[in-house]
Amino acid sequence: MCSISGIIVKDNQISAKYSIDMMKILKHRGRDNSGLLLDDEVIYFNDFEDVEDLEEEMIGNLSLAHNRLAIVGRYGVQPIPNEDETIWLVCNGEIYNYIELREYLKQNHEFRTDSDNEVIIHLYEEEKLEELDGDYAFAIYDKSKNVVRLARDMFGVKPLFYVDRDKYFAFASERKALWHLLINIDGCERDLDELNSKIKTLKPNSQLIYYLDDNRFEIIEGFKKLELNYMKERSYEEAKEYLDRALKNSVLKRVRGLDKVGIICSGGVDSSLIAKLASLYCEVILYAVGTENSEDLIYAERLAKDLNLKLRKKIISEEEYEEYVFKVAKAIDEVDLMKIGVGIPIYVASEMANEDGLKVVLSGQGADELFGGYARHERIYRERGEEELKKELLKDVYNLYKVNLERDDHCTMANGVELRVPFLDEEVVEIALSIPIEYKMSELSNRPYAESNISLKSEPINGLKNTNLNIKCVRSVRKKILRDVASQYLPDYIAYRPKKAAQYGSGGEKMIYKVAKKYGFSKKRINEFLDMLKRKIVSEF
């Protein structure tokens, strides 16, 4: 959607060059226009060449900066002030209930823009930030109170990082912008692990309040509360109806105002359900990525045909995979084998979406954590019981930001495309986490499941709709209630397809080892290959 960044200098003033350099580093996140507040002076511009002469001339103690990817509103350039310019905002994100909030707030406030983000300023003035429904990371500078307030959405869909050093405090949407300060102000070595060790993540559902008078800050966690008794004593059919309705509402909120949206589609139940629901409200394009003969491509292709949805697919060659390994590592600001393997299909899908002129894609991220989709969830349920699995799912949801969401955001935004995740809507999460465990994990017999080695040339199988896929019967199923909701919209070969990790379904795991081997590193020496990647990332920075 956008990038935000800012610097608070603790003693002497600093030139605008550092803030503008950070904006340049984050430009891929928002190419439509940019804005910078430096103390009391504000500049808006479309091209960094327009501000070259100001980089050294402008100095100050505090900056807020923004690069915009315009999605909602034509006149949403930031930083945005309140009516008397005593409060300034920069925000990365989308506010899904902004129309309703705007209607309420305009009774006492004057709006300057048609941006969804502007409601944040006036909610802050009304002390009602908890009414926000959206995915966001923002910074507010309140001159009257002499504070800067950072905040992040409930589940951390939008990233926000910060550093606190002797000379300055700074924040940014991506760590690479903070590397620039650590290297050029603090003189830190170009060592990826060392640089990242100095950077902290603002946790989801948290606010950081920086007091400018004495250069200190405090963090307030859990400023919004989840209602986890939502589905208490509901029958299975009632729970299905609630979940179905909430998912449709969530998808509708995330495509409102869009004529066309992309879906990062693996051919699994999660992304396929989101695709089908989105197609009820706007045009949908599926983006599927994998290596030659990867399962995800085969399933996605069949799904697109059966549901009459447009599909763009990309088969990644070994040579291309090498290129994407480096691109993804650079995008996510870290070197982690699993994150790179999962990130490559996301990166390539968003690259294709950008080529098609799309600014928004949806994914099925979060469903496994909410409904018990991993093998370890079933194992915990069998061995340790329902209460332990409840705790595990809750922990997984709150850890999504560092395990998956920051990676996914960086991979899509590297291509100027915003990712939205309907499963992490607050109402959907409240319903999912309060659904009884036995509705998610159950003993079944004779339930059709698509096999891994599918054959599209085989004869149709009785009992499966719209498919020629081979099936087998299994005794247990994870994500039962979600699969049963999905079966109302999708062929059974998708609704009941077994879980397969993205890096395996796309064929990427094996390909990464091939890339490492090309550089002289065997599978046993994969960590040496990763170390080489780390050096390459920071050397090119």
UniProtKB/Swiss-Prot annotation:
CDD domains referenced in this protein's UniProt entry, alphabetically: Asn_synthase_B_C, AsnB
Pathway, per record: Amino-acid biosynthesis; L-asparagine biosynthesis; L-asparagine from L-aspartate (L-Gln route): step 1/1
An MF annotation (GO) of this entry: asparagine synthase (glutamine-hydrolyzing) activity
GO BP, one annotated term: asparagine biosynthetic process
Signal peptide stretch: none
Family of this protein: Belongs to the asparagine synthetase family.
NCBIfam families linked to this entry: asn_synth_AEB
Descriptive protein name: Putative asparagine synthetase [glutamine-hydrolyzing] 1
Annotated source species: Methanocaldococcus jannaschii (strain ATCC 43067 / DSM 2661 / JAL-1 / JCM 10045 / NBRC 100440)
